[in-house]
């Protein structure tokens, strides 16, 4: 009888272990736009223990606004941005609890953008936050907190195979290798190329008094108290921080300030002193003001690094051989940052000159018309590039041009739906262009993935041969004299950050 019981226990234990592993494979790796939560969380666990001077927690505002790498570059301070999409305050608390098992930061920054939100996050967002965590008592408590607030079940978190069983037909090599060599080095941060300026009406309302009398929710305040207690227990100072966001108001600021005053917590609101770090709503945001792009990120990061240097006196570890991986990763970051320049150019003439650099392969595809609004100086640049006269003088027609290393290697135009498909270097390019009466479209695929903005005018997709990825996708509406730019956001979360 005893042997049967032991055999039964062993069977179910083995079954659970196998099912858990299969379940892990079935968990979606999530798209880059969702924030790569698995890669970034696994990277946290891969860090050498007790090497972080500071930790940054919160939702997407935290990891898009601050990168530990420019902080390291300028100050030799180590930090990690440990957050995930739409993270609620109760989940952030358990992230802090998890972090203190592996790191001993002296300061903990909590990004307050979603701290006051009482409504639970959606199912997908909760999964992105909880699935990547190692199984532990902390994770179990976090799951119980979330399932207690939603219709999600405990079993579906403990055995994700129950939730994702339909993914069998979708599995790829990445599902079996996630968490191995992820090629990610951003220390928790993500960078976005490209600028989408904030709207004028939103700028007018930014940090204004809406007349609301806001009070921080009592149920969320309980988690603030738990965070304070947790940080004190682990010898860390808790600091509230609010990174730039165009929808933040004076009333929201006052709500957090009142809470900070009540708890005796330092509160840094970047929305109250934009001139001190040079915030520019034209160039520093990737999505019209909700999140920072790489330009805004560097400004916010540098200010935070200076703050830590001034108030905490952290040792500059840039010459310390124990931190060689930081040096190597910071060099990679700097290279990518410098190459981001193209994604912030708003002028057509400057853009046409930029894409002629040796490192780029660029594809031009016209939708509807790209001729009627061309200025004379732009026409001269196009002629010097070797662009067909028909693009310059042919209204409502289609055009496809391939530029590699500054040279036109192929082009076609005409009053018909145009299609071009060839391999250029190591990438496969498929392009389609249709004038007003011939499809009215512009499509560019790089290795099968669509990148074109598909807007009226001249659509340009730029591939960087050194970084081995698309770094920008824009359209200039040259069908009228304004030449207005539209940019399709490129989130470079994949292999770089």
Describe the predicted segments one by one.
Residues 12-78, 88-98:
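Membrane/wall-proximal cationic-aromatic binding patches
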């Amino acid at each position: 009888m005893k042997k049967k019981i032991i055999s039964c226990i062993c069977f179910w234990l083995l079954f659970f272990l196998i099912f858990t592993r299969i379940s892990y494979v079935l968990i979606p790796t999530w798209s880059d736009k969702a924030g790569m939560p698995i890669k970034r969380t696994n990277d946290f666990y891969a860090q050498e223990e007790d090497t972080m001077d500071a930790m940054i927690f919160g939702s997407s505002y935290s990891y898009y606004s601050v990168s530990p790498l420019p902080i390291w570059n300028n100050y030799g301070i180590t930090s990690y941005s440990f957050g995930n999409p739409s993270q609620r305050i109760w989940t952030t608390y358990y992230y802090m609890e998890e972090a203190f098992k592996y790191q001993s930061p002296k300061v903990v920054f909590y990004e307050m953008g979603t701290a006051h939100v009482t409504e639970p996050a959606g199912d997908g967002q909760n999964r992105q936050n909880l699935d990547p965590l190692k199984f532990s008592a902390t994770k179990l408590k976090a799951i119980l907190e979330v399932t207690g607030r939603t219709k999600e079940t405990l079993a579906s978190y403990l055995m994700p195979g129950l939730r994702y069983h339909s993914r069998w037909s979708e599995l790829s090599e990445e599902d079996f290798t996630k968490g191995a060599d992820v090629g990610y080095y951003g220390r928790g941060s993500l960078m976005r190329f490209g600028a989408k300026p904030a709207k004028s009406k939103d700028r007018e309302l930014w940090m204004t008094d809406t007349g609301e009398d806001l009070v921080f929710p009592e149920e969320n305040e309980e988690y603030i108290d738990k965070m304070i207690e947790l940080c004190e227990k682990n010898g860390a100072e808790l600091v509230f921080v609010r990174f730039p966001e165009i929808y933040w108001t004076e009333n929201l600021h006052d709500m957090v300030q009142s809470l900070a005053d009540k708890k005796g917590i330092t509160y840094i609101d970047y929305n109250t002193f934009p001139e001190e770090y040079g915030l520019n709503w034209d160039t520093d945001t990737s999505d019209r003001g909700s999140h920072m792009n790489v330009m805004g990120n560097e400004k916010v990061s540098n200010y935070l690094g200076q703050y830590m240097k001034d108030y905490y006196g952290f040792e500059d570890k840039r010459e310390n051989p124990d931190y060689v991986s930081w040096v190597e990763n910071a060099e990679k970051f700097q290279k990518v940052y410098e190459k981001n320049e193209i994604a912030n150019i708003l002028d057509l003439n400057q853009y046409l000159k930029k894409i002629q650099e040796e490192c780029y392969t660029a594809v031009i595809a016209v939708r509807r018309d790209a001729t009627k609004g061309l200025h004379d100086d732009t026409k001269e640049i196009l002629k010097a590039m070797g662009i067909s006269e028909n693009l310059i003088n042919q209204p409502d027609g289609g055009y496809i041009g391939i530029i590699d290393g500054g040279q036109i290697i192929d082009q076609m135009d005409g009053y018909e739906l145009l299609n071009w498909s060839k391999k250029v270097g190591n990438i496969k390019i498929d392009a389609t262009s249709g004038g007003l009466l011939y499809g009215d479209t512009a499509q560019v695929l790089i290795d099968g993935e669509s990148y074109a903005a598909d807007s009226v005018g001249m659509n340009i997709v730029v591939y960087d041969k050194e970084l081995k990825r698309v770094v920008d996708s824009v359209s200039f509406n040259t069908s009228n004299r304004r030449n207005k730019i539209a940019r399709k956001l490129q989130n470079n979360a994949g292999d770089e950050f």
